């Protein structure tokens, strides 16, 4: 009795293994996102061919030859490109060819019918691929990594700094490295700390391929949520003052609102026509202001998300916004070098604080002062009450100051630059407390 059973299993098991089809979402989409989307996505469309959705990937490009034809390898232009021996024909262009294992997946998928196993063939592939673990951060950095995001813990005892595939955590007392939070995208472009819970929101991704917002436990580094998946980077994030809402914006031009603590997606705002570069809340948490590469800033009324006003006073991309802590005014700064204060009531400029900042990068706000960083190597400080420039913070920065964060508990400002330098300033005395290079290899002061 045993031998017939074993014999039948020996015939049946290979058929079971062969019956498992190649999954588009699990097997094919991750390759398209990682290897092809940077040249054939929403931001760059070479050969008039896109792969950022299943529906687009199946269409012909400028060659007018269909990319994938079910059961027909010889008629599938994309398969020809993936396997071509001539480097001029082969894709990915100017890059290593796909691994043989990856090409074999495409071959089987086409032979099996090139089917879609998701629920929406028009959805971005980044929303369909399984949740991924990012590469491990290097033990140390061979060269400095630009500091693109900073945030303090609510008590101001530690500073969280963007890194390469990680977020590094540094002591505010002496600038020593405390810990490293891995499993993060290639770049971190914004950091936001929840006002009460130990949650850190990290926006970023892999440029041109993947965007996402990851929520970590700030103390343990545990990954709690992955939100706002997109086909390009997420650029900004902001918790409301009460912490009950999280606003997220990115290169897809959409502002997404999440209900905390479960981080449920409750609202999408599509009023901008280009990247969302900055987000900030008013003091009561019922209004959200945005900045965009479309040269405008907008104010929305929550919870419905009605647009109240659009400010169009800048000539280039808006890359920093803040709500006045006491008035219904907004501060916005632009790549054109301007820093404007304008009224939400009518969208008219109240005053222009500065128009000679070269390229402005970030804004930070205290109850009495506004701080702006730019392509200069100094931080400019303005009085909120009268809009006058009252001080310039100059220190060891030797390159563009690309990020900043304010610590209201201790009245300190942190700034980070393109060379990986981080400075901590005391605002009362307007003096540098200390500085360090945010490189895990170099924990000593410069």
Regions found by a protein language model. Give the residues of each.
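WD40-repeat beta-propellers
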Residues: 150, 167-171, 211-216, 255-258, ...
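Conserved strand-to-loop turn within each blade of WD40 beta-propeller repeats
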Residues: 162-164, 203-209, 249-252, 291-294, ...
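Residue-level detector of Asp-centered blade-edge/turn motifs that repeat once per structural unit
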Residues: 154-155, 195-196, 241-242, 283-284, ...
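Hydrophobic beta-strand positions that form the internal "hydrophobic ladder"
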Residues: 159, 200, 246, 288, ...
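Aromatic- and Gly/Pro-enriched helix-to-coil junctions and flexible linker segments
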Residues: 17-148, 152-157, 163-164
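WD40/WD-repeat beta-propeller blade N-cap
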Residues: 140-147, 182-188, 228-234, 270-276, ...
């Amino acid at each position: 009795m045993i031998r017939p059973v074993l014999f039948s299993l020996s015939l049946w098991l290979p058929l079971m293994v062969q019956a498992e089809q190649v999954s588009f979402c699990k097997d094919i989409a991750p390759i398209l996102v990682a290897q092809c989307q940077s040249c054939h996505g929403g931001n760059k469309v070479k050969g008039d061919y896109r792969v950022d959705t299943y529906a687009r990937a199946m269409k012909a490009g400028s060659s007018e030859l269909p990319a994938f034809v079910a059961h027909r390898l010889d008629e599938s232009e994309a398969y020809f490109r993936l396997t071509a021996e001539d480097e001029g024909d082969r894709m990915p262009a100017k890059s290593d060819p796909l691994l043989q294992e990856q090409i074999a997946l495409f071959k089987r998928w086409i032979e099996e019918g090139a089917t879609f196993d998701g629920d929406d063939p028009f959805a971005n592939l980044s929303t369909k691929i399984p949740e991924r673990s990012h590469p491990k951060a290097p033990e140390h950095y061979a060269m400095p990594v630009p500091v693109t995001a900073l945030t303090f813990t609510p008590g101001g005892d530690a500073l969280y700094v963007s890194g390469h595939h990680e977020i590094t955590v540094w002591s505010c007392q002496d600038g020593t490295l405390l810990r490293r939070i891995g499993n993060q995208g290639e770049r971190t472009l914004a950091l936001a700390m929840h006002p009460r819970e130990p949650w850190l929101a990290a926006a970023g991704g892999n440029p041109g391929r993947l965007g996402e917002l990851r929520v970590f436990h700030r103390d343990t580094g545990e990954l709690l949520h992955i939100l706002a998946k997109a086909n390009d980077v997420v650029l900004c994030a902001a918790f409301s003052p009460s912490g009950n809402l999280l606003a997220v914006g990115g290169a897809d031009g959409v502002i997404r609102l999440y209900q905390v603590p479960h981080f449920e997606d409750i609202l999408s705002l599509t009023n901008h026509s280009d990247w969302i570069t900055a987000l900030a809340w008013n003091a009561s948490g019922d209004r959200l202001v945005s900045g965009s590469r479309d040269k405008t800033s907008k104010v929305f009324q929550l919870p419905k998300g009605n647009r109240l006003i659009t400010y169009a006073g800048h000539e280039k991309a808006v890359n920093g916004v803040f709500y006045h802590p006491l008035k219904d005014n907004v501060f916005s700064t632009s790549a054109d070098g301007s820093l404007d204060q304008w009224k939400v009531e009518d969208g008219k400029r109240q005053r222009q604080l500065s128009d000679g900042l070269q390229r402005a990068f970030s804004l930070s706000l205290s109850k009495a002062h506004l701080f702006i960083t730019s392509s200069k190597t100094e931080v400019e400080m303005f009085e909120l009450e009268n809009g006058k420039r009252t001080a310039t913070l100059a220190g060891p920065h030797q390159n563009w100051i690309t990020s900043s964060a304010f610590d209201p508990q201790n009245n300190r400002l942190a700034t980070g630059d393109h060379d990986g330098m981080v400075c901590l300033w005391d605002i009362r005395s307007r003096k540098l407390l200390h500085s360090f290079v945010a490189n895990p290899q170099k924990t000593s002061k410069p």
